[in-house]
Amino acid sequence: MHISISLLFLGSVGLLLQAQSPSADLILVNGKVLTVDAKDSIAEAVAISHGKITAVGSNEEIRKLAAKDAQVIDLHGRTATPGLIDSHCHFQEAAVLYDVEVSDPGIKRISDVLDRVQAKVASLKPGAWVRGSGWDEGKFAELRYIYASDLDQVAPNNPVWLEHTTGHYGVANSAALKLAGVTRETKDPPAGTIDRDSSGQPTGVLKESAQNLVRHLIPPYTHEQRRNGLLRIMADFNKEGMTAVKNPGIEAEEWDLYQELLKEKKLSVRIFALWLGGTSTSSAREALQHIARLPKPPQSFDGLLLSGGVKIFMDGSGGGRTAWMYQDWNKGSTGKDTGNRGYPNTPPDAYREMVHMIHGAGVHVSTHAIGDRAIDWVVDTYDQVLKEKPTKGLRHGIIHCNTPTDHAIETMARLEKEYDAGYPELQAPFMWWIGDNYAGNLGPDRVQRLTPLKTFLARGIVWGGGSDYPVTPFPARYGIWASIERKTLKSVYGLQPFGTAEAVDVHTALRSYTAWAARRLFLEDNVGSIEPGKDADIAVWDRDLYSVPSDELRDLKCELTLLRGRVVYQAPGSPVAMR
């Protein structure tokens, strides 16, 4: 039974639940509980039995529901929320530590990256690969790409591949380009770009599918490396009050590792896995073959692992100016990247055929679409297949959905209402972490359309919040903050080039990383709010999200995380602990 409790009705509802609920084996008391239920109710305490929430109410009422041997967590006035959910995170991909990590704030200029590459090279034999991730030209003092000529200075005898923070482009040194056979005569592959200097010589920067010219040569990580990385990233998520994630683009190897950890009872984060559908009907068909053997959501493995659907690509990156737009990309905000409107990563007609195939199989699909033209194509495709085969509840999504047109917004609103489909899966931290790049590439006429949360809300569109980690840092507190503040990291084009007209309040921002995100994972009956009948996925914070200045939200510290009533993170030194 799902019962929402407001402070005005704690007494009567508490007595009702006492008569109908089993004795609680765990209670949380003396806190401020932000339930994120339909009424946004606030309570003091929570009763839990066998990992399920049985009551929410006042301290007095919840203590009456506790069994004699119940464990008690005194919140000491701290604030509890539902466990936070990331609706788009490359969980397993990011779980493996790269040899060279260059995404942290200590990287100020290209020479800082080169220092780390040089240090890694010193530990390797000549010919061994150096791989890294996380660079972003928008954070460099030089405001330019890293080139092969830069890397050659510190790694003349070792092939190097450094992936951009977006994952949509990267840079190889000359040794890697030589192994890949990339020369000035090499043609751009379909849906890819080999960046070249004014003489036509490759610079080392490879975009979209061109990355595969080098990436396929890099030795894969071992099973043990991937397993250890996954255990580590789950612990890191729990430390940030996070308990569920939608992992896009997995393949059989990744699914098998999830199954392995599930059997060993080592999953401390719920996983909704989207299978990689690629950019062709054959790759989408292969994904469907895997999915056909597994339960469809909301059915799952022990409530912790779901085989959720298929991810496919429509276009590229806003950071790399490869996303498919109606008008030319800008360059440096007021300049023009003349003739460059990006391009579809999947041929548009092939994409439409793929969606027909996936939808026809009764399977959920989420599509990567960043550019306005790409988003229009995606929502029109969803509209077409849903009219041809009306199916409610597959919840087809638009990943990123950065620059939607008015047409796209109206179509999404209608699809959500009529078919429970067409949901944006948004990354508010884009505005912060890679926002300077976006502001420069979109230009002053389009920049305030980025991630239009307030417009979505006004049209009745709900979305799931996410990070796209490792594109941006994964803690959901950053996404909650960015949804409200819309500030960039370095203020290259001003502190708030995206404006504040599309900002939302903290209640909406929190809901996008809890109740609404749970719906994107088909788990809204299990998690996403603190209500009787749901699993006790709960995070406890050092301050009240609803009352602190919004700029403090990115500094939130998690003190305790529960997954089904089990402690999966306890902050050292915190008084909030199981007693």
Each predicted region: which residue ranges?
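Extracellular/periplasmic ectodomains of large secreted or surface enzymes and adhesion receptors
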Residues: 570-579
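Acyl-CoA/ACP chain-elongation machinery
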Residues: 402
